[in-house]
């Protein structure tokens, strides 16, 4: 009779599945019980985000100082605008030529965009002007054969 202990409790209940724990009902029930609930919002879920900023935004949020990401200089925006107009392209035409959204071209021209080397390279080739380095605004030389 040593195995007959009236103080031990056996719980015959399975743990809920992942789908159940993600539901709104399960989250509110857990909050009512006082359990720890961690929620996180999916960023850009269901959208086609091709060029995501690779800078560490969480690290930037933790910093106490006033820090912000470097933006495209206005000088580069003016060069893009002039090069585009010299080729007779609208923002929409340039965007379709480089497979980007017109909004991205507008952001680069206004100086609001965070520089992305892929996008900058596409724009450089489309308008034929350098946008990076020290020779900003000079014509892009043809690639020399190796």
UniProtKB/Swiss-Prot annotation:
Cellular component aspect of the GO annotation: nucleus
Claim: Ligase is one of the keywords in the record: no
A Pfam family assignment: MBF1
Major place of residence: nucleus
Ranges of compositional bias, category Low complexity: 17-31
Keywords, in A-Z order: Activator, DNA-binding, Nucleus, Transcription, Transcription regulation
Name of the protein in its database record: Endothelial differentiation-related factor 1 homolog
Organism name: Danio rerio
